[in-house]
């Protein structure tokens, strides 16, 4: 899954902190294989979250955790994220 978040003007630092808090919690979830956060070099305040889970069930469990609920509640005040800024992906098998 990839999520894109653009910080509201003047709130990039606060959004960055919320993302860091979320990452610290999510990385400890048993079904989380990868949770990496990035900030665009050319667009300060634009963040990308890259997440990989062991299974669809692990991702569903992740969505029910308190840190995720807290993050989702905080995002509207800090970000201009729109529907479609979250993309679920399936890996292409090579070989």
Q: Residues of each region from the PLM?
A:
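Solvent-exposed, non-membrane alpha-helical residues enriched in polar/charged side chains
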Residues: 4, 20, 24, 60, ...
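Short amphipathic alpha-helical segments
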Residues: 11-33, 67
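Short alpha-helical
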Residues: 10, 42-44, 54, 66-70, ...
């Amino acid at each position: 899954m990839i999520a894109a978040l653009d910080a509201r003007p003047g709130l990039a630092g606060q959004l960055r902190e919320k993302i860091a808090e979320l990452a610290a919690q999510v990385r400890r979830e048993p079904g989380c294989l990868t949770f990496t956060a990035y900030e665009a070099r050319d667009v300060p305040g634009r963040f990308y979250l890259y997440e990989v889970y062991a299974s669809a069930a692990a991702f569903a469990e992740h969505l029910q955790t308190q840190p995720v609920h807290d993050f989702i509640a905080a995002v509207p005040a800090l970000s201009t994220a729109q529907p479609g800024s979250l993309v679920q992906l399936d890996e292409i098998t090579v070989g």
